[in-house]
């Protein structure tokens, strides 16, 4: 049982009511190679750690960043690179991260951008006036579109997907706030070792081109997102 939340293009429900997206397709292929049939469930993202630790789900697989959470879970991957970025309205005078000083930003709750802006541990991220943490990711985009906030921060692929789906006129800042790997999280108390086999399977899928084939359906420069070796530098 795979837990995730609605996060296009990684994880969403298609027009026929079926699970779809990058992570869904990767999971189906990887687990079928391993002899499992995945079942996808939508979870309360804020409660993900409890759900996996209690065994209500077997793993968390939905564009989940490894960085800073390395010791919280047993990880498979990282299988993809992701850039956490800041987006503003086209007309905004914000062009670089330092321009965010004393501005209002919206993020999805329990995500890396929320942590980065609230904890202020990275010197390149200025102190903002206010951080709005929203459980529903759609609300961050609505807040920006209506001008309630000055900026939003999220995974670049997800922002670009929203811009494409809704013809939203946002501008993504050149400086990212974090380059991170995305992985599949299993509970620390899970002794089955599935994550090790899954890591090997995902690597094999990158090697044989099947991961790239899946990504190409959703993003234009698939190779860029599979260069996870750059995280080891």
Residue spans for each PLM region:
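Periplasmic-binding protein-like
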Residues: 4-5, 81-88, 164-203, 221-233
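Extended ligand-binding regions for polar small-molecule ligands
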Residues: 21-33, 94, 98-104, 109-112, ...
